[in-house]
């Protein structure tokens, strides 16, 4: 396929994007909005953003969800701008500097919250800056400008959502159904590999792939939840299926680790059962029936606890999977599964990374302000806006440098493209709304094709071109103003890129260490006799942290194995029959406090000291377990955990 070819699957979204732009343009001029450009720009960004992220037409609900986030972010930004202006209108320079700090603060928050919701915070930061900069000449018009901006953005979002509904968006439901079947087959094949106890690298690749697929399934669940209210029951089941899938991975990997020291625990009966190859979910269903009969026949006590737990989790997975596919009423048995343990939310391990993002964004905006004041450039406000937009959006993504490069390419491409529209097309079509709409529809259609291919610069070119062409009411054609706007965008992107290059993000190793210590803390916190604490479901949070670790350190198998071992220790200790008495309960609290000190330690020396204290306390704890005659189900996991912490002490304490 050629570089400029158009694939059939890309046409529908390109038409959808063109329709959203035309609708926003028509409504903006019909209702005599002062700057219909904002409505058109909003419609284009809201529609094209999810397509660029997905690399194709986004699934149903994605555009609506992004639109809602944009509305929330705009209102937060407008309120913040009003507060800043009212408080500091007599000190314009201080007002702009405080607004720069606000943009950095919003970027800091967006780096800590869920990636799906971070868009609203990033948007609220640069919305406030846009308002503060725009009203410099007429500060008394601030409330009117904020209201107009909110109205234009709501119109643009409404047009994007309407266009999405008109062109029958794709439903993700069929993809979810297929993935549920495929995932269960892959889970069974992972257990086969672990029972065989073959090549460790093959097992690592298999469970790593399953962790990624389970995380992807959770993302599909979010999309399905956004799609329609009729999937509420399926959404509840998919939440439980996420935990069950992670449980299956954990039990399989623990089965592999157990065979390193006690291979005799896996009897020949189960080895023969798992030798049967499976290709479909029906094959897995038949095998599970056979296993349940064998477990009933041999008895629970004669069945390895990991296999017993795995078969139970796989059976529950099958039951909920059928419910998701049929979307029928939740049965009493399913309700019992769904009313399981409360899920504990993950605590961010990227606080240092978020602070780096804060300084990058704040310094970029302050540098832009100083450049504007020093040069007295008439388009300094446009340059400031681009700095805020680029840094706010780039900081939330894994590779901010590439986002900046994308914007630089986009603004460079927007210069000749905008020139064509400014000098030739718009002056010759402004007398006819039909021709004006058609000209912008053509722009939206062809850039919509490139956006779906994730062409470098396509997203930036779409936003930058719409931003510099004349779509105001009434239209005025001042070439110097156009050139200033176009150059301001380019300079703003380049200044943001320079700051990102100069302010290095060296938080990767620190984030990795914090993640590993959080795994240790989770394993230690599982040693408790508190009934409420034992019922907490930390598995999704732990695997979310493992997924982040895999993304931060691709190919670092020792880190992945250590993290997985800590997750297995957490699950085993959580279910272990720890003796209930006051002496152990007090010591459990002491262990948790020490583990928390390890995570929060500000220096390597403190961290080593607290980690050494934790190891000493674990040795004392093992002695207490011996005194209180704890069963092997408790003493063996604690001994394995202590051994792992001794072995990887340097990796867990050094920066």
Curated annotation (Swiss-Prot):
Instruction: List this protein's GO terms for biological process.
Output: carboxylic acid transport
Choose one Gene Ontology CC annotation of this protein and give it: plasma membrane
What family does the Swiss-Prot or TrEMBL record give for this protein? Belongs to the aromatic acid exporter ArAE (TC 2.A.85) family.
Q: Which InterPro entries match?
A: PHBA_efflux_AaeB/fusaric-R, PHBA_efflux_pump_AaeB
Query: Upper taxonomic classification of the species?
Result: Bacteria, Pseudomonadati, Pseudomonadota, Gammaproteobacteria, Enterobacterales
Kindly give the membrane topology term recorded for this protein. Answer: Multi-pass membrane protein
Q: Where in the cell is it found?
A: Cell inner membrane
Residue ranges in the Cytoplasmic topological domain are 34-37, 90-92, 142-151, 391-406, 452-458, 503-655
This protein is called what? p-hydroxybenzoic acid efflux pump subunit AaeB
User: Which keywords has UniProt assigned to this entry?
Assistant: Cell inner membrane, Cell membrane, Membrane, Transmembrane, Transmembrane helix, Transport
Q: What does this protein do?
A: Forms an efflux pump with AaeA. Could function as a metabolic relief valve, allowing to eliminate certain compounds when they accumulate to high levels in the cell.
Q: Which NCBIfam families does the entry mention?
A: PRK10631.1
Top-rank taxon, per record: Bacteria
Instruction: Name a GO molecular-function annotation.
Output: transmembrane transporter activity
